[in-house]
A protein has these predicted regions:
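Extracellular/periplasm-exposed beta-strand and loop segments of Gram-negative cell-envelope proteins
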Residues: 36-66, 88-126, 152-178, 206-209, ...
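Transmembrane beta-strand segments that form the barrel wall of outer-membrane beta-barrel proteins
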Residues: 196-209
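Repeated loop/turn-to-beta-strand initiation elements of outer-membrane beta-barrel proteins
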Residues: 79-82, 140-142, 193-197, 229-232
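Short glycine/proline- and aromatic-enriched beta-strand/turn motifs that initiate or cap beta-hairpins
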Residues: 16-89, 262, 266-268
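Residues on the lipid-exposed face of transmembrane beta-strands in outer-membrane beta-barrel proteins
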Residues: 28-30, 70-74, 130-134, 148-150, ...
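Transmembrane beta-barrel architecture of outer-membrane proteins
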Residues: 23, 65-69, 125-129, 143, ...
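Structural signature of Gram-negative outer-membrane beta-barrels, strongest in the C-terminal barrel
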Residues: 198, 218-219
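Cleavable N-terminal export/targeting peptides
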Residues: 1-23
Length: 269
């Protein structure tokens, strides 16, 4: 028995001393939303900011509790990598509303959705990220890097109301994609050869053409390399997004805040 334990310890030590695969990484996990809050308004161009509604409260949207989240990188040089990430939140609702609100039709004309109107709604919120990371300090113990890239938000909101004022008017749906540049900072610290904790943060504030946007995203996590090519991880993540669009036919305002826990499996080659 002692010989078997000694052999197992020797094998583990030898494996720990082997270089960790680090050229390609893929993370797949579940993002459990502890908090999701948002506000949206779509009004005629000259009205101003208008009154925002909460899709969850006003429209009865049932936001998913856990969503799929994918992240990863391709390290084409020891200090240079391409990064990517995606997750999406989808929801539908059907509610007889108890507070009237304003919207617009496809021509930009104001519409009132009165109390007791039955509203069928849908929300699709997708986040895509692609970027470049420069690890200006990269050792077996610590990786510290900065990067830049694109944060691409796709927002689609569909509404259909049984009663409108003026009557029988279609509602202007929201379907927009906003690619905005981000700046990122990454810190990875190996407590042991197999265990690390990490911090990733991204941010931007930008105005261009008809768009104004701001975004921040922070993830703090830890990861255990259970096998040479497979790791198990957990983390806490939060982000906030604000976008404004001034179109010829409408003004769109949208902001949301998301926070939650991430559990995942990662593979490395």
């Amino acid at each position: 028995m002692f010989a078997v334990i000694s052999l197992f310890a020797t094998v583990n030590l030898a494996q720990a001393e082997e270089p960790r695969p680090d050229k390609f990484g893929l993370l797949i996990g579940g993002y459990t939303l502890a908090r999701y809050s948002s506000n949206i308004s779509q009004t005629e161009p000259d009205l101003g900011a208008g009154i925002s509604i909460s899709p969850e409260d006003t429209l009865g949207l049932d936001i998913e509790n856990t969503v799929l989240r994918i992240e990863g990188y391709y390290r084409f040089r020891p200090k240079h990598a391409l990064t990517y990430a995606w997750y999406g939140i989808n929801s539908t609702g059907n509610k007889i509303i108890d507070n009237e609100f304003e919207w617009v039709d496809p021509g930009g004309n104001p519409i009132t959705i009165p109390i007791d109107a039955q509203v069928t709604s849908s929300l699709d919120y997708d986040i895509f990220k692609v970027g470049y990371l420069w690890s200006f300090h990269h050792t077996d113990k610590v990786e510290l890097g900065v990067g830049t890239g694109l944060h691409i938000t796709r927002l689609a909101v569909g509404l259909d109301a049984s009663i409108t004022a003026p009557p029988n008017q279609p509602l202007q749906n929201v379907d927009t994609t906003v690619p905005l540049p981000v700046f990122s900072v990454v810190l990875n610290y190996h407590v042991t050869p197999k265990f690390l904790w990490y911090l990733k943060t991204e941010a931007f504030v930008l105005k261009f053409d008809d768009w104004t946007g701001s975004y921040r995203d922070t993830t703090l996590g830890m990861e255990y390399r259970a096998w040479k090519h497979v790791a198990l991880g957990a983390g806490l993540s939060s982000n906030a997004l604000e976008i404004e669009e001034d179109d010829l036919n409408y003004q769109l305002r949208f902001n949301n805040t998301i926070s939650g826990a991430l559990l995942y499996v990662a593979t490395y080659f």
